[in-house]
From Swiss-Prot:
GO terms for biological process: rRNA base methylation. It holds the Pfam family Methyltransf_5. GO terms for cellular component: cytoplasm. S-adenosyl-L-methionine binds at residues 36-38, 56, 82, 100, 107. It catalyses: cytidine(1402) in 16S rRNA + S-adenosyl-L-methionine = N(4)-methylcytidine(1402) in 16S rRNA + S-adenosyl-L-homocysteine + H(+). This is Ribosomal RNA small subunit methyltransferase H. One of its GO terms (molecular function) is rRNA (cytosine-N4-)-methyltransferase activity. It comes from Xanthomonas oryzae pv. oryzae (strain KACC10331 / KXO85). It is an enzyme of class 2 (transferase). Keywords: Cytoplasm, Methyltransferase, rRNA processing, S-adenosyl-L-methionine, Transferase. The keyword S-adenosyl-L-methionine applies.
Length: 337
């Protein structure tokens, strides 16, 4: 299998393409284009009748997509979050969907985007700079309780209250407008330890996730992806921290495995799976880590959408409607699951 261009090294490149099982005339959707590393790999396997849809909420990523693939009739480009992919594709029409979650390498590397605590820049953190509040705007008006809740919920930061109090105290003296200001402030109030991780890592992650509604988008996007897939279509998701991976793992398990039985409740309708787990957590090997250290925290999960047998349910895959495995289907809609 060919390798991606050296200028951009997408994580788990070979594993993603193997997981998607790209076919020559298939339809695929990359919901997080970034700089197009995975998308290039998909295109290499598509023939003239294949189709690739790419999405990204970052206008800079969309500009790269248009410059790189704008002349390719097989590619259609859409600006927006993958949470809205149902507005881009019809139900049960896609053979494979990739979601590569979190912040992209270019976003981290450009100081002006305000994502990095290692490079001073405006305290922004928005993946779509034309939408919503910047991190600086939110920190300027949030209460210490709200800040602490965000740091704990999205960063699992144990010192969330201490950091929140410090932010509120500092902004009373001067506005927090730069990433270096915030990173230095957090470092100054954190207990000294032997950790090799920068003391602002969890806080920056938490604020970024909150500002961009990343976990909300993920939950909505997973539901939309399942509806969009054809029977036999595959969903591949790369996550970079435990909060994301937990949501992905639980989503796939919910539609692939029967819920635990409860002897105190009436016997439930037979469970009919909607997904089949193709693999457990896939991580980068040593060879990839030597080339791309960012892959160290990456976790890939792949699942395949199943076709319901005749009689299992009248909610057929081609309708795109997703049966809830926790709820029985009324008898009027067909055989109970």
């Amino acid at each position: 299998m060919s390798q991606p261009p050296a200028a951009h090294v997408p994580v788990l490149y070979t594993q993603v393409l193997d997981g998607l099982q790209v076919t020559e005339n298939g339809t695929y959707l990359d919901g997080t284009f970034g700089r197009g590393g995975h998308a290039r790999g998909v295109l290499e396997h598509l023939g003239p009748g294949g189709r690739l849809l790419v999405m990204d909420k970052d206008p800079e990523a969309i500009a790269v997509a248009e410059q790189t693939f704008g002349g390719d009739a097989r590619v259609s480009i859409h600006r927006g979050s993958f949470a809205g992919l149902g507005q881009v594709v019809a139900a049960a029409t896609v053979d494979g969907i990739l979601l590569d979650l979190g912040v992209s390498s270019p976003q981290l590397e450009v100081a002006g985007r305000g994502f990095s605590f290692g490079k001073d820049g405006p305290l922004d953190m928005r993946m779509d700079p034309d939408s919503g509040q910047s991190a600086a705007q939110w920190l300027a008006q949030a209460t210490d309780r709200e800040i602490a809740d965000v740091l704990w919920t999205y960063g699992e930061e144990r010192q969330s209250r201490r950091i929140a109090r410090a932010i509120v105290a500092r902004r009373a003296e001067q506005p927090l407008l730069r990433t270096a200001q915030l990173a230095d402030l957090i470092a100054s109030v954190m207990p000294r330890g032997d950790s090799k991780t920068h003391p602002a890592t969890r806080s920056f992650q938490a604020i970024r996730i909150y500002i961009n509604r990343e976990l909300d988008d993920l939950e909505t996007g997973l539901d939309a992806a399942l509806a969009a897939l054809k029977p036999g279509g595959r969903l591949a998701v790369i996550s970079f921290h435990s909060l994301e991976d937990r949501i992905v793992k639980q989503f796939m398990a919910r539609y692939a495995k029967a819920p635990p039985s409860n002897r105190r409740l009436p016997e439930a309708q037979p469970f009919v799976p909607t997904l089949q787990l193709v693999s457990g957590a896939i991580k980068a090997d040593d060879a990839e880590l030597n080339v791309n250290p960012r892959a160290r925290s990456a976790v890939l999960r792949v699942a395949e959408k199943l076709e319901l047998r005749i009689g299992d349910s009248l909610l057929e895959r081609r309708s795109g409607r997703i049966p809830n495995p926790q709820s029985p289907i009324p008898a009027s809609q067909g055989d109970a699951r």
